[in-house]
């Protein structure tokens, strides 16, 4: 990977440290993208890291994805997930999805923009976002600290496979992980012919 673009408008908070290993106590209060850029550059100085301190919005999502080969969804909110999905379908970019909640996580590759009719998009699986009261954030619901790392590693693996054009990606499959049972489950996904996006 030669270039990473990271977009987020949040700052590092103490509550992030147990589940976000790129950040440290010394960087509390710094923009998350700046903290992540420091950590990632230390891990691999040959990869350029572009830190964009912006929230993903309808007004900027296409600009943020311009020149990007693969999009990795690390969003912690549903509006950003739907914006990324819709833009990736429109722009023909693969979206590597990952989500965590309490003791469970899931990952998939949504690539409907390049595989119209044969691959689902995020909206095929989740047509509408849940109401806010049904979707607490990590601080409210709690998340097992290592779980974002497990799901993040799966996402990184899928991104590398997409970039190199090797192996079978999770396109058309949802991989679910239950940390309490230490069990993975795979569900086949189909494109929704009624999906308004893909």
Language model: regions and residue ranges:
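Adenine nucleotide-associated cytosolic modules
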Residues: 1-198
